[in-house]
């Protein structure tokens, strides 16, 4: 019984494969016209002599490998399109306008507390004048350091 099922399954698979590969009824059946067109176009390119370089480059540039970036500039020779590195390597940060190493915003400057002991001649009036700012140079880096040096 199992061998009968195996033979029927094999027959069914063959029938499905035949039906799937057969052309659709009512569709125009071309008897190799597309192959003839390709060969005719290739013969025309061979007749033109050296003018077929541009067509050949366009024909074989499918987007694979080096030929994906080739194009002609209208004259003799070929140029290569620029290859853009999208964030790979050392300059992976998209917008670094020279802010340098001190451009990290991982802290809140308003909540910064200076834990150093104030000097003995520290005036309370100075604190009343500038309550938010404890010291000109803080212990953490400033968010915008444009390389002006120390002041």
Curated annotation (Swiss-Prot):
Q: Which residues form the propeptide?
A: 22-54, 103-135
Q: Which residues carry this modification: Leucine amide?
A: 64, 88, 99, 148
> Its principal location?
secreted
Query: Which residues lie within the region annotated Disordered?
Result: 131-151
Q: Which residues form the signal peptide?
A: 1-21
Q: Name one GO molecular function term.
A: hormone activity
This entry carries the following GO cellular component terms, namely: extracellular space
Q: Where in the cell is it found?
A: Secreted
Q: Which keywords accompany this UniProt record?
A: Amidation, Cleavage on pair of basic residues, Neuropeptide, Secreted, Signal
Q: Does the keyword ATP-binding apply?
A: no
Report the Pfam families cross-referenced here: Allatostatin (PF05953)
> What's an example Gene Ontology biological process for this entry?
negative regulation of juvenile hormone biosynthetic process
Statement: the UniProt record of this protein carries the keyword Secreted: yes
Name the family.
Belongs to the allatostatin family.
Protein purpose:
May act as a neurotransmitter or neuromodulator.
The protein's name in its UniProt record? Allatostatin-A
**What is the species of this protein?**
Drosophila melanogaster (Fruit fly)
Phylogenetic classification of the source organism = Eukaryota, Metazoa, Ecdysozoa, Arthropoda, Hexapoda
